[in-house]
Curated annotation (Swiss-Prot):
This is Cell division topological specificity factor. It comes from Aliivibrio salmonicida (strain LFI1238) (Vibrio salmonicida (strain LFI1238)). The keyword Cell cycle applies. Prevents the cell division inhibition by proteins MinC and MinD at internal division sites while permitting inhibition at polar sites. This ensures cell division at the proper site by restricting the formation of a division septum at the midpoint of the long axis of the cell. Belongs to the MinE family. It comes from the Bacteria. Coiled coil: none annotated. The keyword Cell cycle applies.
Amino acid sequence: MALLEFFRPQKKATANIAKERLQIIVAERRNGGPAPSYLPQLKEDILKVISKYVNVSPDMITVSLEQKEEDLSVLELNITLPEDDN
């Protein structure tokens, strides 16, 4: 039994190191570098178009660009629409 306990802490340390490294890699891939300079203007333009049809404020819209692969980016647009008062 003592022999197993001797090796057990090393496995946990190795697993923790691997987990930390993986978290760093995932975080770097999510960020994908700085956001494009056109993103704020795009959000403003989208807000203007949506405001023609629905009463929304700028804080109700989030726009993000995520680099999935080297040649693939995903533009994500989330809009919180107000409840319809019929």
